[in-house]
Amino acid sequence: MKEKKHFKFDGRLVFVGFGSIGQGTLPLILRHIKMPPDRITILTGDNRGRQEAAHYGIKFIINPLKHDNYRKILDPLLGKGDFLLNLSVDVSSAVLIEYCLQRGVLYLDTCIEPWHGMYTDGSLPLSKRSNYALREEVLLLKKKYPKAATVIPTHGANPGLVSHWVKKGMLNIAHDVLGDVKVPTTREGWGKLAIKLGIKVIHCAERDTQVAHPRKQRFEFANTWSVDGFVSEGRQPAELGWGTHEKHFPADGYRHDFGCRSAIYLGRPGMSVK
């Protein structure tokens, strides 16, 4: 059965990075978005996914982006109205976002990444090596370019897709409790709906149901996420969201001295926390 095309995109699309997520996303884009394969380019740092790209007739370029070459590489590939889909690691999301804001390019990624080595850079204080710091850096760009092209960062599964499910869940509860409700269109609107429903905190947990071969043994830890991401983020300081209602504070906890201060961090890497 022929799949329905939900949208027609006339611009160019550039993948930055083409690991497992990229290879899984490409056929979905071609299935659900009307755009010719010759307007898609894959820009990546290694040979992974070449066969997948060839199967769909997609241009495949191996040329790792670095802080001193990204503009030269991207300039011929992207212009106003085009789309950069960032699925890479070790490439600064903030740098790519600002590049897109300056050129009118649409942007989407699954997480905010730094340049290679930032997580373990001893010249930076722990606070500056955190995901909190990466997020604050991106939020500053929103203020710097208030009327630029649309940028959606950290829209993977969680955070990202889970936000849509949470909103749908809130609407289901509202329908059962309050009757017909108007769907909120702003952040403040969703906050007001949460107050009406008596919601104070929403915690999203994941249960991994993947089964590999050979099967995981008892007491064995198996990582089913990105290996690169798992290792690099495990070396970052452990981070916790921290609300105004908290009644205690960890013995080795520290507060950030910049940004919205909605999180704290521990003075040790995440991989050491039990």
Describe every region a protein language model picked out.
Residues 1-11:
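A short, basic/flexible loop-to-alpha-helix module at the beginning of a structural domain
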Residues 14-19:
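Conserved N-terminal Rossmann-fold NAD(P)-binding element of oxidoreductases
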Residues 21-24:
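Hydrophobic/small residue at the entry helix of a nucleotide-binding pocket
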Residues 36-54:
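NAD(P)-binding Rossmann-fold cofactor-contacting core
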Residues 65-78:
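Conserved Rossmann-fold cofactor-binding substructure of NAD(P)-dependent oxidoreductases
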Residues 91-105, 110-148:
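Rossmann-fold NAD(P)-binding glycine/threonine-rich loop
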Residues 126-223:
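Rossmann-like NAD(P)H-binding beta-loop-alpha module
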Residues 199-274:
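Glycine-rich, aromatic-lined ligand/substrate-binding cores of catalytic
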